[in-house]
């Protein structure tokens, strides 16, 4: 089958002819319709320090997708040939304390599709049936293909009550922008997103941010005055992984504020712990999606009118995957979709 793989420990992704994955008793086989390129895939393409420590080479990569079930293992119940599905990219052990308590997103033994085992940049993907999520008929293939990153945004944004709250989002990447859309949709008052990328800040405005702030050109404190804010932000969503952005967020938070952190710093960072202690801030780390409550919330948000369409900015056939990676690496894109249909 046709697939995109990391073949060598160097920059790049390559189109290969790969064996079709074998189906286990508890697995489903998915014929991929559309894939999306994740920031993780860009890290793997660039072969940065994280990738070098994490990715076994060769490896078929990718974990954002939608497709159709074409084969079902003999022990699988609840799915049928022809079902349209996406899937949870973290495959959990099922026997650790968190798994047995229903907190599978905190599994200490999780492995990643397209990271530790063959992924979805391929004509066919095999995953445990447990990991599959059936897509409602009134949700498009394109939106279903980005459920994985959308789930990160939903998990982060819905960590705290947002109704009537002032929200600060650090980082206008695709996940940060989708989080802004979620916050506005569920009733936040002001949703302010910060970055230094003018293209993505403009896209964040289209996604519903009250104010998109280029922190290289204007002060966050001035924006707060402009919005009539006198006590700081109630909710912070850290999506950037940038130490300077997190420090600025701590300063801008109201006493008793709550912060959800999804962004991963590239190296250890220092902060003023006095900001946390004396303000009584609550900080929550976010990893992946809650299985499968986040997935149900994603569907419900879209079905209730949440518009994510502006986030998809580029579409290419899978044979043009290099153009897709070039767009993602340029920073001048939202989500990039790769189509697997016949030309």
Curated annotation (Swiss-Prot):
Name of one Pfam family that matches: ADH_N
Main location: cytoplasm
Site for Important for catalytic activity for the proton relay mechanism but does not participate directly in the coordination of zinc atom, residues: 148
Entry's cofactor comment: Binds 2 Zn(2+) ions per subunit.
Keyword tags: Cytoplasm, Metal-binding, NAD, Oxidoreductase, Zinc
PANTHER family: L-THREONINE 3-DEHYDROGENASE
Function: Catalyzes the NAD(+)-dependent oxidation of L-threonine to 2-amino-3-ketobutyrate.
Protein name: L-threonine 3-dehydrogenase
Native species: Pectobacterium carotovorum subsp. carotovorum (strain PC1)
């Amino acid at each position: 089958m046709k697939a995109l793989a990391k073949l060598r420990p160097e920059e790049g992704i390559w189109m290969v002819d790969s064996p079709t994955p074998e189906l286990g008793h508890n697995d489903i086989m998915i014929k991929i319709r559309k894939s999306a390129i994740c920031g993780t895939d860009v890290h793997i393409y660039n072969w940065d320090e994280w990738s070098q420590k994490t990715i076994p080479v060769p490896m078929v990569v990718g974990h954002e997708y939608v497709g159709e079930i074409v084969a079902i293992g003999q022990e699988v119940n609840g799915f049928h040939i022809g079902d349209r599905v996406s899937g949870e990219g973290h495959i959990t052990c099922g026997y650790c304390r968190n798994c047995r308590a229903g907190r599978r997103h905190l599994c200490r033994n999780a492995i990643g599709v397209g990271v530790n085992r063959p992924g979805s940049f391929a004509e066919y993907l095999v995953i445990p049936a447990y990991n599959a999520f059936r897509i409602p008929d009134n949700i498009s293939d394109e939106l279903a293909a980005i459920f994985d990153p959308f789930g990160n945004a939903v998990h982060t944004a819905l960590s705290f009550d947002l109704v009537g709250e002032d929200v600060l989002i650090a980082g206008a990447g695709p996940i940060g922008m989708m989080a802004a859309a979620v916050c506005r949709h569920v009733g936040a008052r002001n949703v302010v997103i910060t970055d230094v990328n003018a293209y993505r800040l403009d896209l964040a405005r289209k996604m519903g941010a009250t104010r998109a702030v280029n922190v290289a050109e204007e002060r966050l404190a001035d924006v707060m005055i402009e919005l009539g804010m006198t006590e700081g932000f109630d909710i912070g969503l850290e999506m950037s992984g940038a130490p300077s952005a997190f420090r600025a967020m701590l300063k801008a938070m109201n006493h008793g504020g709550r912060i959800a952190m999804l962004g991963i710093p590239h190296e250890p960072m220092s902060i003023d712990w006095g900001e946390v202690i004396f303000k009584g801030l609550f900080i929550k780390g976010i990893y992946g999606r809650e299985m499968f409550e986040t997935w149900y919330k994603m569907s419900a948000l879209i079905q209730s009118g949440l518009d994510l369409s502006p986030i998809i900015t580029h579409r290419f056939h899978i044979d043009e995957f290099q153009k897709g990676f070039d767009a993602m690496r340029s920073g001048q894109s939202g989500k990039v979709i790769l189509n697997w249909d016949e030309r």
